[in-house]
């Protein structure tokens, strides 16, 4: 989403990322961006509702499923909807979309957004280091460190992000978890039990 926001900034279009910061898996990246002075890039979904109109475009990134969007209220209130995703299409897709960029052969949504960035604006407008590392982390996560679902385009996107300043060492730090998080996850896994058709009961 931060890559799409950078495209909006390059095009001088006001934009924000609607995200519940207390429930996102991208907390480390968001914290790094906030520390770099980009706190205004983010807004709570409920806080976004008053600024939405029929002229507002909602860009959904990395999912096509209605049940996985950050806020259905935002989706329903926006006048236009665009979807950027790489997952193979199944049930529950967003029917309201006015524009769909669906590329199942891409390794990740980050790869697609990185390709878009190479065709927008001048070199000086490109993502900063933290934004580039966020995109690279998306590629590394979805490809399991470039071992699955990679192609020429994947490595070209990664090379572009390296040119923008992304460092793999910094990217790996985004995946680091605290000891509290690690022990909590380990406890959840160890206490999980099989229940009715392989559903997990804790």
Walk through the language-model features, giving the residues of each:
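A structured phosphate/pyrophosphate-recognition subdomain
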Residues: 1-13, 88-199
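Active-site cofactor/cluster-binding pocket
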Residues: 38-99
